[in-house]
Amino acid sequence: MCIRDRIYGKNPVTELLKSGSGVDTVLIAEGMAPAVAAYYTALAKEAGATVKRVHPNKLRLMTGTESHQGVAAFASEIEYATVEDLLAAAKAKGEPPFLVLSDGIEDPHNLGAVMRSALLCGAHGIVIPKRGGASVTPTVIKSSAGAAERLPVARVANIGETIRRLKEQGVFVYCADMDGVSLRKNNLTGPIALVLGSEGSGVSQLVKKLCDGVVRLDMAAPGTGVDSYNVSVAAGIILYEIQSQRAVEE
């Protein structure tokens, strides 16, 4: 059965997960037979959905029924695009691609703020991971001030592989990190993608090695005990600089 974005019951959830439709979260009741729980966990991971174990009473409250059969799925808040869709959007506008990639941004408020800046600075879309980062939830949409519903979002299984594909298509990939080159010393025109790392550990070393360049934001007051910008603030600064350089290039 389905109530708006909530699908519950063993067969409906199984069919939804196998269909490839966007699913953000699968809830599995505590106490479900281990083999059955493992089956739905495997299906959910294959579909790129987050799995949460919850008390049966909570599942009843969230589905509005006792007939949930121990499992429910929550559909994605938006229709996700593909990376190819994002590149095609740039081509349709006659512009070099300008993409933002999340390498594990976890806080939905940060992701929403990044999306807002990306839209206002002219990015053609944002790429987020299926696992290991925030997906587009109601909190993200609210934090983005509506940008999440206007900015194309692609969700991929592997950010590293996506970077490789973008580079093959002539996109120059930068990431933001403290040991990079000062922001304004970089040429940020042309086909470009900016990778932003997680709040705790930043861009992963594997992803960093794949990037063509690393940009750094300088600080006017070093030694204060505050050693970095919030990821959404850093994103806004870098994205504005990219927008400015691209405007001059035109």
Please name every model-derived segment:
Residues 4, 103, 183, 219-227:
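Short pre-catalytic strand/loop immediately N-terminal to key active-site residues, enriched for Gly-Thr
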Residues 4-89:
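N-terminal positively charged helical leader segments and presequences
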Residues 14, 120, 141-147, 209-250:
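Structured adenosyl-cofactor binding patch, chiefly the S-adenosyl-L-methionine
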Residues 18-22, 88-181, 185:
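RNA substrate-binding interface of SAM-dependent RNA methyltransferases
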Residues 31-32, 131-133, 199-201, 219-225:
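Short, acidic/turn-prone active-site loops that include or flank metal/cofactor-
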Residues 36, 133-139, 201-210:
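Short, glycine/polar-rich helix-capping loops at beta-to-alpha or helix-loop-helix junctions
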